[in-house]
Amino acid sequence: MAEPLVLNSVIGFGGAIENGLIAHPDGRTIIYPLGSTIVLRDRADPRSQEFLQGHSDKVSCLALSRSGRYLASGQITYMGFTADIIIWDLESKQLIHRMALHKVKVQALDFSCDERFLASLGGQDDNALVLWDVASGNAICGSPCNTNFTNCVKFFNNSPDKLITAGNFNMNVWTYDAGNNKLRPTDATLGTLKRVFKSVVVDANDEYAYCGTTTGDVLQIALERVLFKNTGPAKGNVQMGVTATCEVPTGDILVGGGDGSLQLLRKMPALAGTKVEGAITSIALADMNARGFTFFVGTAMCNIYKPATSRLKEELVQTAHNDKINGMAFPNEYSEVFATCGTGFIRLWHLTTCRELLRIAVPNLECFCIAFTTDGSAILSGWSDGKIRAFGPQSGKIIFTINDAHQKAVTAIASTADSSRILSGGEEGMVRVWRIGRTSQTLEASMKDHKGPVNCIRIKGSGDECVSASSDGSCILWDLHTFKRRTSLFANTFFKSVVYHPDESQLVTAGTDRKVTYWDAYDGNAIRIIDGSDLDEVNALAVDRDGEALVSGGGDKLVKLWGYDEGHCYFVGVAHSGAITAVGVTPDKQRIVSVGTEGGIFIWDYQRPQTLADI
């Protein structure tokens, strides 16, 4: 039976989830989702993290009780299935209740002021409002919402039996009738106004609700009679809609926009403003002092900002990929930094502190593969426009570009041991060798045998041989002196990844047939075939520098650590909520890094498998 792989730290933030960033009242912790995992992070130290794991799919919403004792989280699931709501005890970090009523998705959650009730809102396929008893985890009562879609739910701050919901052209104030065990709605009177509401905040005295709309205005609703009172900002609407709202202790309203703008409103005129990268999806008030207040802002670009004081001067606290990560790479014999690539960005990270060291932006293009030159002088990358771009690892400035390196996208790249040549693989099936001079990049050879995209290229330490893995069901070993095929490996699969054993006598491949196959590197015969996954394809492989352990990851979202010689899975890491696209073992054998389609970077403690010598 495989043991769990210990998750050391995570780089990532589910920025697209509305109100997904929460500041805990203890003054030390911020809470946010990443895929199916909930991260509890120390504000000052990004490496000080704890994880709540219990969801089977992506977390869709979070809510924290007023005292900070309880955390509720909802998830999204497959069509036709019920989505779980989990209540966590944050003191013990334990799961208290798991509740399921809503179909497909839990849209929003909120605790009552006395922490007795939890309100949950179903997604588009469910659209029901349910009231839960926090102590027992049982549903108390429920009601279908408006015929149109409802986006958000918020309890009053002083009345535990009153709450407000708002959505597409609808707004209701609900009162819980305990005697009859019913939720009774009151429609808001908005006159001729028609709005799609994205966020709701109730003021401290329960007098007014402030509702952000896709039109870009904020409506002030008098809650006693549920009547439209005022609108703002006074000097024009927020571009791309109001996506997040929050009341600060002074009674002013913080408004975040889809264009990344942040404004502080007092009686609807704007007092101050700033702009951040990405649509603002959550605003979390942290603390208040004599000079002003502190809060955190989460954006759809997966950035977390901390604008300090009432003048809104922002500081970037944390950043992450906002889309799938296609590849990752370590420099040769150096474990402190690693690079990742995805749509529009290459990022360089510091492993120990989990901080971004460098961000290279190439807008509107996707980077499919990344590698360091062996001497560490350049970051090599292959792009969707068929170009190979090399960047300086410290400056981020472009060193050279090979235009039209491939007819289609560049899907695989590698550097020889002397850094004098680059090998690249293309979506059209070509493997090309490039001579890199001081001022020139010359095509040495173009090897055409593959009929499908080249997904991975590895070069032998001596530099006289390489192997390319392709979606056409073949891996080809090439002689880099004659540029001819030495031998081929065939299987009924799309090969996704290939690695050499450190002694280079064997190759290991993985692909869509869910098998991990060992091959003799000289004659191309299969030596051993093991089941890499029970459910889905295996996308990524890595071997440690001594050849003791093999690490795999794929569509089953599991990181598996195998004993290389025995072919036995000793450790399994569970944290990803999307397919794993790349894995790597640090050269010092202390950590394993995995990246996936959810945009998260997961750092695991390396565990040495039991070898034949230990038995």
Swiss-Prot record:
Any one Pfam family match given in the protein's UniProt record, by short name: WDR90_beta-prop_4th
Keyword line: Cell projection, Cilium, Cytoplasm, Flagellum, Repeat, WD repeat
Keyword Cytoplasm included in the entry's annotation: yes
Superkingdom: Eukaryota
Main location: cytoplasm
GO cellular component assignments: axoneme; ciliary basal body; motile cilium
Positions of WD repeats: 54-98, 101-142, 145-184, 232-275, 320-359, 362-401, 405-444, 449-488, 490-529, 533-572, 575-614
Gene3D superfamilies per the UniProt record, alphabetical: YVTN repeat-like/Quinoprotein amine dehydrogenase (2.130.10.10)
CDD domains linked: WD40
Localization per Swiss-Prot or TrEMBL: Cytoplasm; Cell projection, Cilium, Flagellum
Functional note: May play a role in cell growth and/or survival.
Family to which this protein belongs: Belongs to the CFAP52 family.
Name recorded for this polypeptide: Cilia- and flagella-associated protein 52
Organism of derivation: Chlamydomonas reinhardtii (Chlamydomonas smithii)
Organism lineage string: Eukaryota, Viridiplantae, Chlorophyta, core chlorophytes, Chlorophyceae
Gene giving rise to this polypeptide: CFAP52
